[in-house]
Amino acid sequence: MTPALLYWNHVCILHNQEKNFLEGLTARLREEGIALEVRYFGLGYPEHMSEYLARPDAVLPDLIVSADLEVFEDSRIFKKLERDLYPAATWLPLRQGPALDSVRRGTRLLPFLSIPLVYYTKDTSHCAGKRLSELKGLAFGGINNSAGKTLVKAVWSRYGRGAALSLLESGAVSDMPIGAFQQVRLGQSPTALVPSLYALRADGERSFLRRPAEGPLLIPSYFCARNSIPEGAARRIAAEILCPELCDFYVENGDLILYPSCTTGHSRQEGARYFTPAPEWYETVSAEEFYALYGAMLPTAHIP
């Protein structure tokens, strides 16, 4: 029996279904001689994956599926993993296009999906056709997950540190994106940046979905595998996770953008433009510099 330890920190609003899928996968793989063990992180669990992996005594997994992007973006964490990673991005055919181009990160990280964030508003004049850097009083959420952090990083990357500071100073920031959605629904904020799954609740008469001028902000997730597990077993698990059943489920139930070519489903937010931090931004702004600003403006942020 080949043991395989998978760390999972993925789509929290669909987690019950994810867990059911993985329990079934674990049973199927056992029949093939692979003993898959899944450890979950994120909402509903004691800590996020990046918080655990940042600890000096953290046990490294064989496999990772994560939308907690600090695992890959904080060099202090990723350096623990990167030298042992297989070129998993070459293992499965992917759907080519501007969304994939926006989230590629070399050969070691296999893009799985992206959560598109868009405007939800009751006042289209406040946000229609406007850049994220232009909005004052924007509601957004995810202080300790990638939704909030990626927004700040993307604005900093394109418009500068001052724009990121202004966003944090004027924004109405909630613990989670659903909190930002509720602020607009209750009339406490004019516009929120939320996962499109929430914004699709807009009725088109009193509430509306609009896209930022930059395009939807993408929160991607990745699969990666360390050479602590035989490559054949890692490839088998990758193919079983990034499969039509789970990919189609994510599209149909989450309006998510999927990258494996095994699915024919499409998010309603797919288009020609997307907003992500520029790759070179990570080379010029350290994790320490980012968190110095982020933590100073958001006292409840967990600073590694």
Predicted regions and their residues:
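Ligand-binding cleft/hinge of the Venus flytrap
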Residues: G24-R30, Y119-H126, R131-S174
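Extracellular/periplasmic catalytic domains that process cell-envelope and extracellular macromolecules
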Residues: D57-A58, L109-L113, R185-L186, P216-L217, ...
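Early extracytoplasmic/lumenal segment of secretory-pathway proteins
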Residues: M1-D74
